[in-house]
């Protein structure tokens, strides 16, 4: 028994390759895009890093900024949010590492 892989199998192909069309995504308005959670988390962590002087929050804010930058969909709005989060994160790191030390808690 031999199987033929010639033109007969391509004619009987149930997938119909001649009817295939490339996928073209529909344009989505910037207001309808989903929320950029990593950018929002980066802003929150950056602000808490500056206000409460937590180094880990500032470092995590930089990581979330990088993630948000990699997944950026809307250039104008997302870039504003990422730049603000990055500014807070860098400001928190500068004040933590170069600023005056925190007063020690008395026991």
From Swiss-Prot:
It is found in: Membrane. The chain crosses the membrane at residues 82-98. Keywords: Membrane, Transmembrane, Transmembrane helix. Its main location: membrane. The keyword Lipid biosynthesis does not apply. It is a single-pass membrane protein. Residues 1-15 have a biased composition (Polar residues). This is Protein Asterix. It comes from Arabidopsis thaliana (Mouse-ear cress).
